Swiss-Prot record:
Comp. bias (Low complexity): 1-17, 45-56, 100-114, 703-714, 828-861, 868-899, 1000-1023
GO molecular function, one term: DNA-binding transcription factor activity, RNA polymerase II-specific
Origin superkingdom: Eukaryota
Species whose genome carries this gene: Neurospora crassa (strain ATCC 24698 / 74-OR23-1A / CBS 708.71 / DSM 1257 / FGSC 987)
Sequence repeats: 49-55, 87-92, 105-110
Zn finger residue spans: GATA-type: 743-767
Gene induction: By lack of a primary nitrogen source.
Gene3D superfamilies in alphabetical order: Erythroid Transcription Factor GATA-1, subunit A
Ranges of biased composition (kind: Polar residues): 652-661, 723-736, 802-827, 927-961
Protein name: Nitrogen catabolic enzyme regulatory protein
């Protein structure tokens, strides 16, 4: 840059080219006194700073350049300060500039101290001239920093020292900008480089100053107003925490500004100061809060519109204790700290929150536009359900009850919610399986929109704890509670249930209506328990766990559902063995309606092994689920149903309970779920199952179509697979067709286990076993007369075959099998509470009529207490607990119920249902059932009872092969068979005890009977061979 000499002339018209924003119209500026002096220093400054303070006279080229440059720079840089903000201080008109200079000199006398001089020559200037020249230059050179630097305490030199590099770079480029391609831009860039550190320093200083002020402020601002101001400022500066739900939940419990330190933390203070500076807000004024905005911030998604819980802490006077006003709605909760907070995100789940449950469901249709928001739904059909509801609570209009509706159990997410929640028009389950809810039926069990009509209030998925379907039925209230609620609805459900039945043949498993989640664990059977549905679908039955259980996948849950303490260990394997067995829980739903243990046993009705019947179970147990698990489908279901109260029935976990079997029996309809009468009587689901070609046969129906997953799948097993197997027959017998499976011999539809004749036609368990055993078609007269009489004669007299100790795997399980659950099925189907007798193991020959049973030797002297070893005739295979179809593994001594009057193909299933014991027993039942082939009737009861292929089959098939040499060996085969079968076992719904049917047998014979049943194990005799083959094939 042409050296601009520091001559007075040069200084006369100093061009503050140094500052890119400066316009060099210095020729317009009037000369100032002392120009020469200032010029001396200034010229140097101009040169050194490349501000090109060039004398217009001497350096016209320079001046011209500077003119040009500054016009450009002024145009470009003048509008921008170091950080890009428009600089208004560089008005380079002569008047404006002079005024600016004067202003700078007058107001910013300390600029010289605060801002680094453009050149080191400044230090040599005289104080006065130098100050004037410096100020003049500085005003043009550093206008953007005048305001920020005005308050600075450090001198420019110090600042330069702090950031010498940026300043030096800027100086360098300012000097050489003329030689650079992008001169103005480079100068501006270097200026910015220098300015940044200055700004940073300025912020730091201001922060420090603010911090010091804030530290001293608390002592000074002792007045209430000062405190309020502070509190308000804090509130403003501190954005409300959107995640702070507690504030909104209960303001009383929230710490208020009073609890906060009045002195903001340094960070807070600096932030506040910055905010005030940015917003030009003054600390002197108490900010008036826009409460609406704050409230909007605090709006919490809610399932139901509710008064906001204002975070009073966010208000100016939040620190003041809130005065309780009687008129305040939320004061009640405030006054009563013990009361649960009425939070929108309370555990009460929005009934209509569309969640994963409503995947295929039309929540609106299902719920009839039910919304938690619309209490008007009281008038909706749910009202109808309440009308039928015996409880005033339900009649109150629970459907509109926000609490219930939103409660997790009623949430759309839960299969059972709608049923429980009156929110559904027809039934709490209207959404899931309401007549409207064909979608439910079609949709997967877990429909996202199950109970979430769009109309519902704010649905807060995040804030509202939604019980998960998977969790099961009792999310918040326990399945039973819901059931109780549903029970009242049952009448409504009946009407609804019919429609529902068409839509949802299955329970949670196959049932779109009900999420499978509910199916597994909850003793949803209690839903089935609500016999209120009797004629109609029991909402409980519909969406009950059992539904899930119905479905093969659910069956495992079902097993859990029926896990009765100790029984589970031996049955754990079995629990999943047959989904249908497990599904028996679903029977609970339908059975009450059906009153038929056979219906209860329907879960057994289908063979989980059948590909169409239980996908989950089939996958898990390709050969068929282990039959060890008490075929709750048969017995367990029955016992579940036996629980007269569907509410209670869901929980009846002990097979020993006189499950509803007797109740079911009293309602004896054709046992087959497919039985039209039953379907009418039973849940619509049951009917649906019957009608559905894919529905399992009677079993499904019995298990109340809801849970009849099989209804959705072909019941029949693969043509070649297990044709002889009871399970396959049962599942396949009528499953493939929409019509309920009917025994081609006795025409019963309720057998616990379906078998096939050589032609592949379905036979009930009794007929199938009889045919296999004797090679002759079972005489229909035998169905009730002969077998029944036998049961009465021997079974009735016998209190309980011995204690059916659940024989886990081995005779090793002695009479006192680890879980020797001596469950007294107090009443069998006969309702005669047989004396609960623990027959010494020796008394009862444990026979594993089924492979599964054999797996656990009779050692579960549960059957007879006789271990395989103890019974000479019983071998390990026959060791399976003889005590009943319950299950070879665990035979639980169950007081034999008086023989039921329902012998015959269905009788077996009934008797199976009749006696229910813990899972153990169930298993034992299975094994016993397998083991209990003593007679066709017995087989029917026990074999049906046991749905596990081996056990179930064993019950039926093995039964036929009683080992004369077994405990019953002394008895003639016929006697054994009659004993095993008679013992009131047949009449009794198939007791889980299975051969425990032996329960019905005379005391002496009970063990023997058990033994006989067990003795009819593999090798039990020639008949055993056929029977064994039968049960073996069935257990495949």
């Amino acid at each position: 840059m042409a050296a601009s000499t520091t001559t007075p002339t040069a200084t006369t018209r100093p061009f503050f080219t140094m500052n890119p924003t400066t316009t060099e119209h210095d020729f317009r500026f009037p000369r100032r006194p002392g120009d020469s002096m200032a010029g001396t220093g200034l010229g140097g400054a101009a040169m050194s700073s490349s501000s090109a303070n060039n004398n217009h006279n001497q350096h016209h080229p320079m001046s011209a350049f500077n003119h040009h440059h500054h016009h450009n720079a002024a145009g470009s840089a003048r509008g921008r300060d170091s950080d890009g903000r428009p600089s208004s201080s560089n008005n380079n008109t002569s008047n404006g500039f002079v005024a600016n200079i004067n202003h700078q000199s007058s107001s910013n006398n300390n600029i010289s101290k605060n801002i680094p001089p453009p050149t080191s020559d400044y230090h040599t200037q005289s104080a006065s001239n130098g100050a004037a020249a410096y100020d003049l230059l500085r005003s043009s050179a550093f206008p953007p920093f005048q305001d920020g630097l005005a308050g600075m305490t450090q001198s420019p030199d110090e600042m330069q020292k702090q950031d010498p590099l940026a300043t030096q770079v800027w100086k360098y480029f300012a000097k050489t900008k003329l030689a650079l391609p992008n001169q103005e831009r480079m100068e501006n860039l270097t200026w910015r480089m220098m300015a940044k550190p200055l700004q940073t320093y300025r912020r730091q200083m201001e922060t420090d100053r603010t911090h010091r002020f804030s530290e001293s402020a608390p002592q000074k601002s002792t007045s209430g107003i000062a405190r309020l101001r502070k509190s308000s400022e804090q509130t403003q500066s501190q954005g409300s925490d959107l995640m702070n739900l507690d504030d909104f939940i209960n303001g009383e419990n929230i710490s208020t500004p009073a609890g906060l330190s009045l002195a903001p933390s340094p960070e807070t203070s600096s932030k506040m100061a910055d905010d005030r500076t940015a917003h030009h807000s003054t600390a002197s004024a108490i900010p008036i809060k826009a409460r609406k905005d704050q409230q909007s911030q605090h709006m919490i998604p809610q399932s139901v519109p509710a008064a906001l819980h204002h975070p009073r802490m966010q208000t100016e006077f939040g620190y003041l204790p809130r005065h309780l006003r009687k008129t305040s709605i939320d004061e009640t909760s405030k006054r009563n700290p013990n009361r649960k907070r009425p939070a929108d995100f309370s555990p009460h789940v929005s009934a209509v929150t569309p969640s994963y449950v409503t995947n295929g469901l039309d929540a609106d249709t299902d719920l009839h536009d039910y919304s938690l928001d619309h209490t008007s739904h009281d008038g909706l059909p749910p009202q109808t359900a309440p009308s039928s509801v015996p409880y005033a609570l339900d009649t109150v209009g629970l459907d509109a009850d926000t609490f219930i509706t939103s409660a997790g159990p009623f949430q759309q997410n839960f299969s059972f919610s709608p049923s429980t929640s009156p929110m559904v028009s027809h039934d709490p389950f209207t959404a899931m399986f309401g007549p409207n809810n064909s979608s439910m039926h079609s949709g997967p069990i877990n429909g996202n929109n199950f109970y979430s009509p769009p109309a519902s209030a704010f649905q807060s998925t995040a804030s509202t704890p939604h019980p998960m379907n998977e969790g099961g039925d009792n999310f918040y209230f326990g399945v039973d509670m819901r059931r109780a609620r549903q029970q009242p609805y049952q009448p409504g459900n009946h009407g609804m249930g019919n429609a529902m039945a068409h839509q949802f043949p299955y329970a949670g498993n196959g049932n779109m209506m009900f999420p499978a989640s509910s199916a597994g664990q909850d003793p949803t059977p209690s839903f089935a328990a609500p016999n209120s549905f009797s004629g109609h679908i029991d909402p409980t039955q519909v969406f009950h766990n059992e539904q899930a259980v119905r479905s093969p996948g659910m069956s495992v849950l079902q097993d859990s559902l029926f896990t009765f303490g100790a029984e589970s260990d031996g049955d754990e394997e079995d629990g999943g063995a047959f989904a249908d067995r497990n599904l028996s829980i679903s029977h609970d739903f339908s059975s009450q309606g059906m009153e038929e243990p056979a219906f209860d046993s329907p879960s057994m009705g289908w063979d989980p092994s059948l590909p169409g019947n239980f996908s989950t179970q089939a996958a898990r147990y390709p050969g068929g689920p282990p039959r060890k698990q008490v075929t709750i489908g048969a017995t367990t279901t029955d016992y579940v149903d036996n629980t007269g109260e569907w509410d209670g029935s869901g929980l009846p976990r002990s097979q020993s309970q006189s499950f509803r079997q007797s109740d079911l029996r009293k309602g004896k309809m054709s046992r087959t779920a497919s039985t039209p009468g039953l379907s009418a009587r039973m849940n619509p689901f049951e009917r649906l199952a019957q009608s559905a070609s894919h529905s399992p046969p009677a079993d499904v129906g019995r298990s109340s179509g809801l849970s009849s997953v099989p209804a959705s799948r072909p019941s029949s097993p693969p043509p070649g697979a297990k044709q002889g197997s009871t399970t396959n027959l049962q599942g396949a017998a009528g499953n493939s067709t929409d019509t309920p499976t009917t025994c081609t011999n006795c025409f019963t539809q309720t057998t616990p286990l379906w078998r096939r004749n050589p032609d592949g036609q379905p036979l009930c368990n009794a007929c199938g076993l009889f045919l296999k055993l004797h090679g002759v078609v079972r005489p229909l007269s035998l169905k009730t007369d002969v077998i029944k009489k036998r049961n009465r004669g021997s079974g009735a007299s016998l209190p309980v075959g011995g204690t059916s100790t659940r024989s886990k795997k081995n005779a090793s399980m002695s009479a006192a099998a680890r879980k020797n659950s001596t469950l007294s099925i107090t009443s069998n189907a006969n309702n005669q509470p047989p004396a609960q007798v623990a027959t010494p193991p020796a008394q009862q020959q444990v026979r594993a009529s089924s492979v599964n049973e054999s797996e656990s030797p009779a050692s579960g002297p549960a059957s007879g207490g006789n271990t395989a070893g103890s019974t000479p005739t019983s071998y390990h295979g026959s060791t399976g607990s003889t005590s009943g179809a319950v299950g070879g593994k665990s035979v639980i001594p169950i007081a034999s119920a008086p023989p039921k009057s329902a012998p015959g193909p269905g009788a077996g299933s009934m008797s199976r249902r009749d006696t229910i014991s813990s899972k153990r027993q169930r298993r034992h039942s299975k094994s016993a059932g397998s083991d209990q082939p003593v007679s066709a009737g017995a087989v029917s009861s026990s074999g049906m009872d046991v749905d596990s292929p081996a056990n179930s089959t064993g019950s039926n098939e093995t039964m036929p092969t009683f080992n004369p040499g077994g405990a019953f060996s002394g008895l003639p085969p016929t006697t054994q068979s009659s004993l095993g079968f008679g013992n009131g076992y047949i009449n009794t719904p198939r007791p889980m005890v299975g051969p425990g049917g032996m329960m019905g047998m005379p005391n002496g014979q009970a063990g023997q009977m058990m033994g006989a049943s067990s003795s009819s194990g593999p090798g039990s005799g020639p008949s055993r061979t056929g029977a064994e083959w039968e049960w073996l094939t069935m257990s495949l």
